[in-house]
């Protein structure tokens, strides 16, 4: 897999992958805009033919300029179990620490064992503290056919450059 920043043309692929992975899906427009405006803080994993097998989207928090917020991680079903999510996270970690950022944050539902393990291994291997705190409660989300689970904030850092 080749890791690189996304291009505008990747927006539709990120949308489809998010849908297929069962992530909270945003509009195709949002993913396309993301690939334009936040390409420098995101990554896509491409197979030999250029197809998108995974992505990480994130941004530098405007009110906390030393903190990267990881918004979504998606890995195609055929590429799971091969360490691709961790490889993309390491890629982002190297990029943000190289830019002088000290913290990585994300939100995770309490039942998402895979994401919790991913962030725990990242923090451990980087020798960085990891802290979990409640952030969004069910009441913060609109009620629909399925109630949205709460989201806890994971904060990792400070990260060494």
Outline where the language-model segments fall.
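A short beta-loop-alpha structural element at the N-terminal edge
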Residues: 1-14
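Active-site rim helix/loop that mediates acceptor-substrate recognition in acyltransferases
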Residues: 19-48, 52, 57
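Conserved beta-strand in the GNAT
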Residues: 51-61, 67-69, 74
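A short, internal acetyl-CoA/4′-phosphopantetheine-binding micro-motif in the GNAT/acyltransferase core
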Residues: 72-80, 108-109
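Conserved acetyl-CoA-binding loop-helix of GNAT-fold acetyltransferases
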Residues: 75, 81-94, 117, 121
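Conserved active-site alpha-helix within GNAT-family acetyltransferase domains
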Residues: 86, 110-132
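Conserved GNAT acetyl-CoA-binding A-motif
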Residues: 96-110
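C-terminal "cap" of GNAT-fold acetyltransferases
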Residues: 126-161
